[in-house]
Amino acid sequence: MMKQEQMTVVRHKPIAKNIYELMLSGHLVEEMNAPGQFVHVKVTSQADPLLRRPLSLCRIDQNARECTLIYRKEGIGTTLLSEKRPGETIDVLGPLGNGFPLDAAQTGRRALLVGGGIGVPPLYELAKQLVKKGVIVTSVLGFQTKEVVFYEREFAEFGETYIATVDGSHGTKGFVTDVIHERAISFDVLYACGPKPMLKALEQMFPDKEVYLSLEERMGCGIGACFACVCRVPNSETAYKKVCCDGPVFKAGEVVL
């Protein structure tokens, strides 16, 4: 159930160039169940910036009532957020969205997790929960360059993990699709989160596979009221789906990328 709470900053630190890891505590964590969901964060108590920032859930620890968010500092809002210190509070609304379908990967089957840039974080909690239910997990993570790579070691705890960088400074030179092709990675179900070109490439690469894609879109309200994050439905000029509440996770082919 969606709630709003002033959550407390437990830990906040940079983990790569302009990439921050933010741990929050509060009762809101008790409502967080599905990996792939997100929260809407108000970065300041002031009127400006007005809009909240959607941040995906990276880790969920309901016993400790703590959750971890990872974000990129790139604008006024996230720059203000990066200045928050332990002990301060942040206005958080959530959890929002549908999350990844865990039931799509059965015990003993193989799941391929593919993340691009800031689309990597929600796959961590997914990997953790899949491994817990006996699914064999392989992760392929793509970044622009070595200095923005994060969570390689953390994902490796759950299974084989491969890195691709566009400039070749770490791992395979190229894109996540290059790694999948070169390594001939086999899987039963694919989960991915990242920029649209990456998601579209995966959709085209595996037309006969079970593929779930988490979209990254700019959002206004986060609850389906403002229609700022709509995606077109195939074979229709008028039908749309909202990323914030119908998604952010869609089965491949469900929306036009």
From Swiss-Prot:
Positions that bind FAD: 53-56, 70-72, 77-78
InterPro entries linked: Cyt_c3_hydrogenase_gsu (IPR012165), Dihydroorotate_DH_ele_sf (IPR037117), Dihydroorotate_DH_Fe-S-bd (IPR019480), Dihydroorotate_DHASE_ETsu (IPR023455), FAD-bd_FR_type (IPR017927), FNR_nucleotide-bd (IPR039261), OxRdtase_FAD/NAD-bd (IPR001433), PyrK_electron_transfer (IPR050353)
UniProt pathway annotation: Pyrimidine metabolism; UMP biosynthesis via de novo pathway; orotate from (S)-dihydroorotate (NAD(+) route): step 1/1
UniProt record, GO biological process: 'de novo' UMP biosynthetic process
Leader peptide range in chain numbering: none
Keyword Iron-sulfur: yes
Protein family per UniProt: Belongs to the PyrK family.
Subunit annotation: Heterotetramer of 2 PyrK and 2 PyrD type B subunits.
Function: Responsible for channeling the electrons from the oxidation of dihydroorotate from the FMN redox center in the PyrD type B subunit to the ultimate electron acceptor NAD(+).
Protein's name according to its UniProt entry: Dihydroorotate dehydrogenase B (NAD(+)), electron transfer subunit
Classification of source organism: Bacteria, Bacillati, Bacillota, Bacilli, Bacillales
